[in-house]
């Protein structure tokens, strides 16, 4: 690998808001950690925290449940515009 062209890669905690689950993994978002909130993890270390709406904990493909996640009222807007009358 060439020196100096790859982004910084390190541990980050992701929080799935819809499933209320936290998980620690590695990400290139650690380079933007200055702008991110932090969280004290179970191992005693502090990591950057990234909020996500969908992860493997809440995605219908992984959970086997058909759930409509509508964060901004988009389904209602669509039904109002194009729904059956």
Swiss-Prot record:
Biological process, per Gene Ontology: translation
GO MF, one example: structural constituent of ribosome
Record keywords, A-Z: Ribonucleoprotein, Ribosomal protein
A Gene Ontology term for the protein's cellular component: ribosome
Gene expressing this chain: rpmE2
Subunit structure: Part of the 50S ribosomal subunit.
Family, as annotated: Belongs to the bacterial ribosomal protein bL31 family. Type B subfamily.
Pfam family membership, one: Ribosomal_L31
PANTHER family for the chain: 50S RIBOSOMAL PROTEIN L31, CHLOROPLASTIC, LARGE RIBOSOMAL SUBUNIT PROTEIN BL31C
Domain of life of the organism encoding this protein: Bacteria
InterPro entries, sorted: Ribosomal_bL28/bL31-like_sf, Ribosomal_bL31, Ribosomal_bL31_B, Ribosomal_bL31_sf
Record field: transmembrane: none
Protein name: Large ribosomal subunit protein bL31B
Organism annotation: Bifidobacterium longum subsp. infantis (strain ATCC 15697 / DSM 20088 / JCM 1222 / NCTC 11817 / S12)
């Amino acid at each position: 690998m060439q020196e100096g062209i790859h982004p910084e890669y390190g541990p980050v905690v992701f929080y799935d808001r819809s499933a209320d689950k936290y998980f620690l993994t590695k990400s290139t978002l650690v380079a933007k950690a200055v702008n991110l909130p932090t969280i004290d993890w179970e191992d005693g270390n502090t990591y950057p925290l990234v909020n996500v709406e969908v992860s493997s904990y809440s995605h219908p493909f992984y959970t086997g449940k058909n759930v409509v996640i509508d964060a901004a009222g988009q389904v209602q807007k669509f039904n109002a515009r194009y729904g059956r009358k």
